[in-house]
Amino acid sequence: MFRPLLRRLVIGLILQSAAASSVQAQTTDDLFNDSVVQTLEITIHSRDWDTLRANFTSNDFYPADVTWNGLRVRNVGVRSRGLGSRSGVKPGLEVNFAHYSSRGEFLGLRALVLDNLTTDPSMIRERVAMAFYRRIGIPAPREVHANLYVNGDYAGLYVIVEPVDTVLLQRYLGENAGWLYEYHWLTPYFATFLGENLDLYRPYFEPRTHQTQSTFDLFDPVRELFRTINSAPTGSFRDALNARLDLESTLRLIAGEGFMAEWDGLLGYAGMNNFYLYRPPSSAPARLFPWDADHTFQAADYPLLAGAAENVLMRRMLEDPVLRARYFQLVLEAVNAASSGNWLVNEITRDYQQIRDSVLADPFKPYTREEFDSAFAELLTFARTRPAFVTSQVQQNR
């Protein structure tokens, strides 16, 4: 009499254990699996959600629960985020798992960014750009589209973005004990030497690690980096700068930006923008990490060297014959990475087809269906014609 009951109980426990193990076995690779549109749920007090949207220019955090694929994290901090993309209708969000508990995390991540996709009618530029950076060997955040639900209601299509933080540094570099700075655009800045006063560098380079250290410890190396960029003698410029900034990865990053017609990056039309600076704890040179690439793929005939003459770093690197030759070689490698196997065309097409239903269902998107489809067509034209244009630019300038 009891044996069938016992057998059912044992089977139930086994199935329950297997299900739990399946949930526990999930990793960030599953979260950033871009073969599907992910689903993310936020449960937050309705009053807090209304306040967050009403005060969308504020950075105040509100407690919430976050659920993904059966995993639920309680009492995380959620706030509005962004610069020009801030919105009270479809707010960009930061989800900080460690805001209310220093030990808080989700799949090893301390935070996530939810990009609201309000500045790009194609809604795929950011994700395609970061995938391209990774394809050409640049450490870049992982990204994946997700349908976001808030308190059970569809809040629209977002992109989940991996933040540039100590977790990302550890994954890419194998260490994270150094100094990480987030660059902030304040005024047009073109890598000039700001002067001896260390406080002049603080507004542009916000420390994201070691924030309690002295002003000297935090900003003297930053000042000396820009002193070297501006003042190192021509004959020793390359060696002097390479001791402070990894020139190979910097040139590779700028080559990627150049191919993608990024007009709001290191060579931005209004000065440098959208990057992080990392100084390792050893004597190794600093590295740059890209961020916020939703202004890429702007025009197929955008000049490859746009902004190069104004930016002191790029201008001086191009004046060095070795660095100039290497830069144009890396640009051609970027062209090949985009063209090989029709990668860029295929990536744009795949992403568009994957998200189209979610875009059309998004009640808060600031674009019409026609604008979305038109933006996709423009991206395809870019992908098909940009390689030949950039190749001709290299031939004219190398």
Identify the function of each model-found stretch:
Residues 1-10, 16-18:
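Bacterial N-terminal signal peptides that target proteins for export
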Residues 25-398:
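Phosphate/dinucleotide-binding and metal-coordinating scaffold of catalytic cores
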